[in-house]
Amino acid sequence: MAQTQTFNGRRRVRKFFGKIPEVAEMPNLIEVQKASYDQFLMVDEPKGGRPDEGLQAVFKSVFPISDFSGSSMLEFVKYEFEGPKFDVDECRQRDLTYAAPLKVTLRLIVFDIDEDTGAKSIKDIKEQDVYMGDMPLMTLNGTFIVNGTERVIVSQMHRSPGVFFDHDKGKSHSSGKLLFAARVIPYRGSWLDIEFDSKDVVHARIDRRRKIPVTSLLMALGMDGEEILSTFYNKITYVRAGDHWRIPFNVERFRGLKAVGDLVDADTGEIVVEAGKKITARQARQLGEKGLKAIKATDEDLLGNYLAEDIVNYATGEIFLEAGDEIDEKTLKVLLGTGEQEIKVLDIDHVNVGAYIRNTLNVDKNESRQDALFDIYRVMRPGEPPTLETAEAMFNSLFFDSERYDLSAVGRVKMNMRLELKAEDTVRVLRKEDILAVVKTLVELRDGKGEIDDIDNLGNRRVRSVGELMENQYRVGLLRMERAIKERMSSIEIDTVMPQDLINAKPAAAAVREFFGSSQLSQFMDQTNPLSEITHKRRLSALGPGGLTRERAGFEVRDVHPTHYGRICPIETPEGPNIGLINSLATFARVNKYGFIESPYRKIVDGKLTNDVVYLSAMEEAKHHVAQANAELDKNGGFVDEFVICRSAGEVMMAPRENVDLMDVSPKQMVSVAAALIPFLENDDANRALMGSNMQRQAVPLVRAEAPFVGTGMEPIVARDSGAAIGARRGGIVDQVDATRIVIRATEDLDPGKSGVDIYRLMKFQRSNQNTCINQRPLVRMGDRVNKGDIIADGPSTELGDLALGRNVLVAFMPWNGYNYEDSILLSERIVADDVFTSIHIEEFEVMARDTKLGPEEITRDIPNVSEEALKNLDEAGIVYIGAEVQPGDILVGKITPKGESPMTPEEKLLRAIFGEKASDVRDTSMRMPPGTFGTVVEVRVFNRHGVEKDERAMAIEREEIERLAKDRDDEQAILDRNVYARLSDVLVGKEAIAGPKGFKKGSTLSKDTLDEYPRSQWWQFAVENEKLQSELEALRGQYDDSKKALEQRFMDKVEKVQRGDEMPPGVMKMVKVFVAVKRKMQPGDKMAGRHGNKGVVSRIVPVEDMPFLEDGTHADIVLNPLGVPSRMNVGQILETHLGWACAGMGKKIGELIDTYKAAGDIKPLRKTLESFMPANDRNEPIREYDDESIVRLSEQMRRGVSIATPVFDGAHEADINIMLEQAGLHTSGQSQLYDGRTGEPFDRKVTMGYIYMLKLHHLVDDKIHARSIGPYSLVTQQPLGGKAQFGGQRFGEMEVWALEAYGAAYTLQEMLTVKSDDVAGRTKVYEAIVRGDDTFEAGIPESFNVLVKEMRSLGLNVELENTKLDDAPVRLPDAAE
């Protein structure tokens, strides 16, 4: 048995229960963000120039800009980015935006225009680089740093550009008649609606304005009435034959019609169909096959038809009848009178073909193109007199001008597919053919041919990601700039200026800033834990600019649609008003270049499943039959069953196996990342699964993270892609490691131009956006070998590279003295004592010293009227020490502000004149700890404006920072030296040197000892004969010198940044930030939850000895109510409990075997147990090939409990759980005999007990509890404010008043409505009375009564109080004491 593999213990090993092999690699989970923005910026110019997309396309669409006279033109040449001024960490610390300066090369061309001929000749060309503002860059984790905070740009779902056909579902008309409509939606530009009204006339609307007949629109496109009719209708020719007419027999036309009179064959004269009979499709076909060519028609048969052409007297030019006229008795006479031998009529039978366009033409008042253009002009610009030129220009700019109208490539592709056109996707404007095809399709729909579109189908909705949103925003900015440039070009002497003088980049920069700062889609990143970050980046919102609004979104838009399968998660969406409008991308989904969401499928060729994976969008998928991932296969990859369950065109059906051509790649491809983390998801009710997905995102990172015993196999993927855990960029050997960084000497990808050292900085106790703590811990030791992609450091909520949002706790499902009524949770004191659910929270407090009108504010320790006791935590600069324990009301930063001078009395003036200047008044505006917050100061940062003298504290912080930078530089230098000289030594040893330092004998062979005789800096003087080797040495030397220079330069830059002042908001001289960390232990009132939507609030923390315990004395950690399971239907939690129990039992068994191995030295039983627990297959670890040391290391990891993975929809079954319980030596019922901790008596029945994974949620009682006695009041009503943030009071509302009224508590009620609320004078008097120790007071008039009186007066109703004197003194109830 070849035991070749080793296990380093740096990752968690799981037993997989999944049966379905994973073929497709899961795409990087934040690829959506990164790929989109990279495509927009294209920082590095590819060979052959940048393609026309992203930023390049924006510049190309706005430039060239010409002035109004055409005598000069500004062209765009190229753009490039310089390096960002500050790196990511510096931006976070200094509240800056992480951005790179954008340089654009512009070319100004000045023309000479010949006044006589108007010919242009180039007079002058100038090129120049122009700075166009800063462009925010994306961090490696797909976020942006704007003003020091991390933000995410959420992708938006919107209706795809293109054409959509729909009807009103019978709502508009009382008869319930369906009114069909078509809408052409461009990416930008005017919308075109074409719709039927209740009279079956077709109208067009532009931009939802007044409607016009659609024929007017067609006339404006240059068609006349006859052309319109011939486009929409076929013609039938009546040919005169003696006393009757002949009309050709057309099979299609006659099928389904009822014969009014006998149908007679025009050639033979026989009756082929009798009067009153309906002609079926079969009959019509048979008649055609029998050779029926034409049928007889009488003059009467012409009645009711419509003429297809004008009837003209060619001699006089007189028009007798016009095309489209209906033939009635009168017109028939005229017709027969003209003696026409051939009459062409429109093929309209009112059954298969309706007369809608002809009727529309009939009601249309416009006769010519000019009339139609004028009509459209009046609709679009009411009140302006039209001329032909302005009307033509306006009409062309609506749909046919690429600057005003853009269908986009997507729109063109969708339009081609829907209307079966063949235009290139570079044709981005409408064409006459497009509009005609839309009208034709709409009329066919009305005639009952074809289907309407489903707007909720994902083939009709697309995703706009960061890059595209940014592109649109930047285009807006550039267009604003364009106007200014045009005006400046016309008003300035163009010969003397450079492009720089014409451009003011402010509008463009402002558009970017506005988008990142205040757009609805630019959101403050949810950084509670790594899962919430990843989910936020994968979110799809239907809200936002150009999207839906909460109020207007109906039920259909929010609902799950069959096309969501594998694209959008049907489970994860918020509860509340946004339900269904905010969605999450499914695990394997990706967004294609047109913005449609694609899902992967495996191909089935000739009935055999292949490993070829294709990505299809919803439109492409509709044509296929897709089998589920869990369909049963034989060993050759064919389907076992004759009929297979599959999806086709949105329906689930049983199809013969020959018809199935695709299969899902994985059972978890239909759910999102958060839902894929829930084990036994298939056993949970969907509503609870939704809560479970959402609550995992609120789990607070704990001090000790612990991965779940029962996972799904998704945990390492989330930890890796979120960037919380750090993976090695390339393989190598760990050279140095401490808490703040890891240094790895690379052994692969050794590029001569690159440094051979990778340094990974770890984040230590950083504050996240949600005030949770971000802390990374190294997993490697010095000398460890690592491979590319290995996890070398854990982050918040990760353990050994696995996502670890909570802890495994021992749960008993039983009632316990009513303390778990209504989902409450009973905890053991052990949880608190052992810091199981303890988390660290960091708050940031910021204080600014400004320059005020009365003088500058000052940060100082010298604060008026403050005792020395209150200043004990401050240093001489007035800033709190690091490590100080602070509580509510403590001063963090002392600050004084100049007070306004009060006017002086003459006496004061005299005294001041005699005794000189008295110190001007200052008031204390120090920053104090807010109520209800305790903690320890962990970090202080001081920022000074340029040129403001730094205080002692700022200097100390600066010195520490520079020392840290110097240490980093020295360490890097040492590693670089060691690395380079090791490589140099490898090249030189054993070679013959032809030159060397002083005292070296030429021609001798170099050895390690020879080299050691000389200082390392002299080794470069050795030369070898082999030219190739010698050039390698020189290259190494050059690389070494360059690296050294770069290192020093980087150090100098950073020191310079630290020493120079900081950029501050206007008026701010100095800013201090204090970070206070607090350890939050579990306490009653905190919210906890499992992964199955089983949430509850901690009701009581009980001493360990009172908790129920097992026979061996193990106490339960947590007691949950069994009644929380049946009605909620989330049975997954019970299965998880059983499996967790088996995991712990197995771990205990392995632990005992390790102990025996350590005592007796026989590893075979341990190896055997591990091999039987984890049988060899392609998903499990190859335990057979492990050496003994690895087996022990693995067993130590499993001691607390083994880890298993049960993937969603492909997880462990009941039988698997039973087998595992048996392996662990436990009862297969999963129930145990428990004993009451207080009496020691056994409980009557056995109790389900096991390990469940519980999370502590970010709803902590400390952040919610709040009390007030006196605080701020609202200015108008003088009532106390509301809410904890405003330090408000409790509202005594309408219903509470009723309660006091019901009890007859008159005085209490009076106090509530007056002195405890808004009786201003009364509440002051009460305060004074209490201070005096007196308890008599009177209630006055509430301020809200005065507000009411004033509001009535503002309506013109004068309300006055009658001041009649009350004779009697106010009644006072005798005190009980009297």
Swiss-Prot record:
Which key words tag this protein in UniProt? DNA-directed RNA polymerase, Nucleotidyltransferase, Transcription, Transferase
Q: Does the keyword Nucleotidyltransferase apply?
A: yes
Question: What Gene Ontology cellular-component terms does the record carry?
Answer: DNA-directed RNA polymerase complex
Query: What biological-process terms (Gene Ontology) are attached?
Result: DNA-templated transcription
Identify the SUPFAM superfamilies for this entry. Answer: beta and beta-prime subunits of DNA dependent RNA-polymerase
* Main EC class the enzyme belongs to: transferase
Q: Which reaction does it catalyse?
A: RNA(n) + a ribonucleoside 5'-triphosphate = RNA(n+1) + diphosphate
Top-level taxon: Bacteria
One annotated GO molecular function is: ribonucleoside binding
What EC identifiers does the entry list? Answer: 2.7.7.6
Q: Which HAMAP family match?
A: RNApol_bact_RpoB
Assembly and partners? The RNAP catalytic core consists of 2 alpha, 1 beta, 1 beta' and 1 omega subunit. When a sigma factor is associated with the core the holoenzyme is formed, which can initiate transcription.
Q: What does this protein do?
A: DNA-dependent RNA polymerase catalyzes the transcription of DNA into RNA using the four ribonucleoside triphosphates as substrates.
| Family assignment from sequence similarity | Belongs to the RNA polymerase beta chain family.
Question: Can you say what this protein is called?
Answer: DNA-directed RNA polymerase subunit beta
Naturally occurring in which organism (per UniProt): Mesorhizobium japonicum (strain LMG 29417 / CECT 9101 / MAFF 303099)
Its taxonomic path starts at:
Bacteria, Pseudomonadati, Pseudomonadota, Alphaproteobacteria, Hyphomicrobiales
